[in-house]
Amino acid sequence: NATSPLESVVSASRRDEVPVSASPGIGLAALLTAAIMATNLWAVVRDRRDVERVTKPAAMIALLAVAALAGASDTASGRWLLAALVFGLIGDVMLLGASSKRFVAGLTAFLVGHLFFVASFVTAGMERPGWGWFGLAVLSASLAVGRGILPGARAAGGAPLTIAVAAYMLVIGAMAVSGWATGLLLVGLGVSLFVVSDTVLALGRFVEPRS
């Protein structure tokens, strides 16, 4: 039976082995992805929006290529993973614009993507549900730091935007908990970074402009 990238990592971690790549080209694709991400980070730090408009979506496309080369389309959890990455790509493209409409579109795309990540984690198997408390702790800390986000969202877009942001918080919380519950440290750290980065983004969007 074929295994998805996430399932192969889960299986290998339980055997204390390193998973074997499904394609010999995955190493090159991973290196290319890392290079694009490094370039995108440089563009963000240097405020090179012209470069970021290219590297941000390119990084997600490269991640999709890595997942595909790893055999993600062969299993249910892998297909959920691919769907999540596609919606992440859409969200990144939407957030390259500054308008409120693009922000809401990006928020919606990421919300759907996070639901697909949850489905991928659940399908792959949550062997250590107790670890979900780590995800809950990360979410709680982020909400404490960003306690002004919802009032800021209400001031910026009224009840509709407030409801959308609140729904997003719930979904990303579910992703954090389910990600940690897989029992995989790297997955847990990854979802935690997502929570932190989205909190920073929301603070910049809804809190700092009002300060």
Specify the residue positions occupied by each region the protein language model found:
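Low-acidity, Ser/Thr- and Arg-rich intrinsically disordered low-complexity segments
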Residues: N1-R15
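Polytopic alpha-helical membrane-helix bundles and their juxtamembrane interface segments
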Residues: P19-S211
